[in-house]
Amino acid sequence: MNAQELKKVAAAKALEFVQDGMRLGIGSGSTANEFIRLLGERVANGLHVIGVATSHYSEQLCRQVGVPVTTLEQIPELDLDIDGADEIGPNMTLIKGGGGALLREKIVAAASHEMLIIADETKVVKTLGAFALPIAVNQFGLSVTRSAIEKMAKGLGLSGKVTLRMNGDNPFKTDDGHFIFDASWGHIVQPKLLSNALFEIPGVIEHGLFVGLASRSIIAMADGQIKILEKKC
């Protein structure tokens, strides 16, 4: 099966965890988009749910396929958050934010009773870091913030480039107006330590390390079979 078909397989399995009346966190990215489309079909057939989307694009897609959406201001507590990931490491540690929605994705995950990840087997890794870590930063003081990130990384034994994400000739902006640094550090063996260190840097708004948020992952294998990974207590 190709990558797109595997995304659909994982998304379809995730629907089995959705119950009538649930308040859903709805993620962003190509795999989450497949889930949204399938969820729209279920809603058309009588399923009653309401969702909080993690990006403008996801919210627009929900509306297009008939999935009711609201905000965390209206529903501050969610039953289940379903989202994709760029990397799935040991014990459900994640790198997310390749699409730029990391801040909203983490807020929604934290507001949910459970976070369920959907992905294909290529996203499962032994050590995080092959995928560049997105770091959302304030536009003010970019060079100072980058220098602080690089200094912190060096102190933790991490090496690699920290580059400003671009959108054509201009810096990429998130839905909330932040810029993103992509940190190519190779291997991240202590994600919790790195997470804490990043949050100590003024100018860092959020980062794509998700530690302790996801409880399980639905993994579509190359042959179309499903594997469920769960966080250890």
Curated annotation (Swiss-Prot):
Family matches, as SUPFAM superfamilies: D-ribose-5-phosphate isomerase (RpiA), lid domain, NagB/RpiA/CoA transferase-like
Domain of life (superkingdom): Bacteria
EC number(s) stated in the UniProt entry for this protein: 5.3.1.6
Catalytic site positions: 105 (proton acceptor)
Binding residues for substrate: 28-31, 83-86, 96-99, 123
UniProt key word Isomerase: yes
Pathway linked to the protein: Carbohydrate degradation; pentose phosphate pathway; D-ribose 5-phosphate from D-ribulose 5-phosphate (non-oxidative stage): step 1/1
InterPro entries to which the protein is assigned, alphabetical: NagB/RpiA_transferase-like, Ribose5P_isomerase_typA_subgr, Ribose5P_isomerase_type_A
GO molecular function, one term: ribose-5-phosphate isomerase activity
Pfam family, one: Rib_5-P_isom_A
Reaction(s) catalysed (UniProt annotation): aldehydo-D-ribose 5-phosphate = D-ribulose 5-phosphate
Protein function: Catalyzes the reversible conversion of ribose-5-phosphate to ribulose 5-phosphate.
Name under which the protein is recorded: Ribose-5-phosphate isomerase A
Organism field: Bartonella bacilliformis (strain ATCC 35685 / KC583 / Herrer 020/F12,63)
Name of the encoding gene: rpiA
